[in-house]
A protein has these predicted regions:
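Phosphate/diphosphate-binding loops
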Residues: 214, 220-224, 228-231, 265-288, ...
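Flexible glycine/proline-enriched surface loops and loop-helix/loop-strand junctions
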Residues: 13-14, 53, 64-70, 104-109, ...
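Long, well-ordered, tryptophan-enriched scaffold segments
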Residues: 6-98
Length: 509
């Protein structure tokens, strides 16, 4: 079963696709808890041994606002389907069932205003049903957190506190770059105006939210901008100084993973071309030229890899740079059960929380995103907008490659919308349409289909500097997104965006 507001290729292959309303995943998770707990379907033995806060969560989830009927109104998923899903999920793997329940969480759930709460709520489901006890059960988002690299040795926070300015350096959230470049230093107590921008490993002119403010800030005459890049990206066009960067083939690094449990070293295939310098070499030399005399500015890749692997965590026991260079990849030394299987969170020993258990506190509370259909009737923008990732690009990376452009051509510059919304606006497939809100607008071609539900429209982040919207403006979906941050972690809220759509001029290209 796939739960997604968009009918993805994965959803099309699933036994069942639930087209949930954007930003309502926390409500669905709490609705599933309501059914599980009201029917006493939780694994009481596991809950008692491995969780903290069960009674508080139980009382909260059994509130009327999380009944299947209430949750159905928020999520758009039928109450009967919610009950059926909860019962099937709780039963999987138990009472002789051969297939345990596993949840494959992905990153999209986090990109809503309540995304942190949503992710927490979903993660509580296997804590209630005990599906962690079964091989193949539980939940996966990413295995990246399983690699206990010594981040403190790499980040050196004590040097930040020893700033010659007498205070810690100001931190600006990268998802609020537009605000930082246009509003910081405007006379409030948020510090001085940003006067220099150093961009590496990113293309904020294309991928940062609230694109119009980002570009307005980058066009400031008094902003000194340095861009360290491999290609002439959107951001490179705004650089006062453009420095050549190597590709991953030209640098050495230690690697964790998103989906496996092997530590690796990636060696250089070739030396850096031309004058390209790695991040390590560039910032080391820059630090020296700025007068810093700490030894860390002389560290190079081998020294940093050694520092990253130097930790007391037993999962890295016996894993050294020399061994990784010799063997290529080495499995993490994780605990195994009597059968030799790794069963994470199957016992309380796995939880590295203050209580030593899976935390159910504070209880998750569903609140609809400010920009969502729950509030759409209050303003001029009634449609929820999904700025989807392209299948053949990584954000804006690879968007300059003709082969990838050809593979993306079918949905490039396209707005997908439901027939109900299209008919209400007298829009047909192929029409030029303007998608707009108070932050900006883009021109696209309409594609009327059933990939989205009524009230939802979708378009892909599929332009680099080599492309533009239909009006000829170099704008993409981020002209519409906001700099509002998620409730946990301060992430971007790309999927909490309201828009309106109107038919455009026929003479746009």
């Amino acid at each position: 079963m796939v739960i997604d507001p968009y009918r993805t290729r994965t959803a099309a292959l699933a036994d069942e696709h639930l087209a949930i309303n954007p930003g309502t995943d926390a409500a669905l998770a709490l609705g599933l808890m309501h059914v599980i707990l009201s029917m006493d379907l939780e694994d009481r033995e596991y809950v008692a041994a491995c969780t903290n806060g069960f009674e508080e969560l139980r009382a909260h989830a059994l509130k009327p606002e999380y009944s299947p009927e209430s949750v159905a109104k928020a999520t758009g998923i039928d109450a009967g389907v919610i009950v059926r899903l909860a019962r099937a999920y709780a039963a999987a793997g138990r009472n002789g069932s051969a297939r345990p329940a596993v949840i494959r969480l992905n990153y999209g759930i986090q990109r809503s205003e309540n995304g942190g709460t949503a992710a927490r709520a979903v993660c509580m489901l296997p804590l209630l049903t005990g599906s962690w006890k079964y091989k193949g059960g539980g939940l996966q988002l990413s295995t990246s957190g399983s690699f206990p690299f010594n981040e403190k040795a790499l980040q050196r926070p004590e040097l930040m506190l020893a700033s010659p300015l007498g205070r810690a350096a100001r931190v600006v959230n990268m998802s609020q770059l537009g605000q930082a470049l246009t509003s910081l230093g405007d006379g409030t107590d948020d510090g001085p105006r940003v006067k220099a921008l150093f961009v590496y490993n990113s293309n904020p002119a294309a991928v940062a939210p609230n694109q119009n403010d980002v570009l307005r800030g980058m066009r400031r005459d008094d902003l000194f901008t340095v861009v360290h890049e491999q290609f002439f990206t959107d951001t490179a066009d705004y650089a006062d100084v453009l420095l050549p960067a190597p590709t991953f083939l030209e640098v050495k690094d230690v690697q964790g993973a998103y989906g496996h449990l092997f530590a690796q070293v990636s060696n250089r295939a070739i030396a850096p071309l031309g004058e390209a310098r790695s991040n390590v070499a560039m910032f080391g030399e820059l630090g020296r030229r700025m007068g810093f005399d700490e030894a860390c500015f002389d560290d190079r890749e081998d020294e940093l890899i050694d520092q990253a692997l130097k930790t007391e965590n037993p999962w890295f026991a016996g894993i050294t740079r020399e061994r990784l260079e010799r063997e290529g990849h080495v499995p993490l030394q994780m605990p195994v059960d009597a059968n030799g299987d790794v069963l994470p969170f199957s016992t309380a020993e796995w939880f590295k929380t203050a209580s030593g258990r899976g935390e159910l506190l504070p209880v998750p509370v569903f609140a609809a995103p400010t920009e969502s259909r729950a509030h759409a009737a209050e303003g001029a923008y009634p449609l929820e907008f999904l700025p989807r990732k392209a299948d053949n690009y990584m954000n804006s990376t690879f968007a300059n490659i003709p082969l990838h452009q050809r593979m993306e051509a079918r949905l490039a510059g396209v707005l997908e919308m439901h027939a109900t919304d299209a008919a209400a606006r007298q829009i047909a497939t192929g029409d030029a349409v303007e998608v707009f809100n108070g932050r900006g607008s883009i021109m696209l071609r309409a594609l009327v289909n059933a990939q989205v539900s009524a009230g939802v429209v979708a378009a892909r982040l599929d332009w680099s500097k080599l492309g533009s919207d239909l009006s000829g403006n170099r704008a993409n979906v981020n002209a519409l997104t906001s700099e509002t941050l998620t409730d946990i972690g301060g992430g971007a809220t790309f999927y909490s965006t309201l828009v309106e759509v109107r038919k455009g001029q026929d003479d746009v290209r």
